[in-house]
Amino acid sequence: MPPKKPEPKKAPEPKKEEPKPAPKPAEPEPKKEVEFNPASIKVEFTPDQIEEFKEAFSLFDRTPKSEMKITYAQCGDVLRALGQNPTQAEVMKVLGRPKQEEMNSKMIDFETFLPMLQHISKTKDTGTYEDFVEGLRVFDKEGNGTVMGAELRHVLRTLGERLTEEEVDKLMAGQEDANGCINYEAFVKHIMAN
């Protein structure tokens, strides 16, 4: 047997670097909500308007000596009595996000309330007829201008500014047809007329 020829030495293969994992996508920074500062709001109401607001505010004053103060819990009610329609989240924001237990104990005077009213009145984003119809069209599975009453009831009770069962019943009274469907264009007209 002939002697084995030594095998030529192979050049060592360069070490393959492990591929680096793809960098994590930058997480979007959570939007920092600007704290509401009543002192930064310029009150632009006329003296007559302010007098009218003061009168309405005083109707909610339950202090023993009529000190022109209301509880935090009453703030949304006063805003609504003055023609505004803020969400509960908006009311909580202008109040500085108080704890639930502070709502009935903390008080606010008229001078502090006025900038809050100004802010709410300037930022209100009232939906138009078209906005509401477009929003309900999402639930129109047949494309025939109607939505299922049961589905609309569920949405009104569980999404956004949730309504109570009684509020939903009042809102939908006489709106459903024999099949339990609601013509949503007529429904929006009905809501906006009230």
UniProtKB/Swiss-Prot annotation:
Annotated region described as Disordered, given as residue ranges: 1-39
Protein keywords: Motor protein, Muscle protein, Myosin, Repeat
Sequence intervals crossing the membrane: none
One example GO MF annotation: calcium ion binding
Biased amino acid composition, Basic and acidic residues: 1-35
Record-level GO cellular component terms: myosin II complex
Blocked amino end (Pro): residues carrying this PTM: 2
Subunit structure: Myosin is a hexamer of 2 heavy chains and 4 light chains.
Protein name listed in UniProt: Myosin light chain 1, cardiac muscle
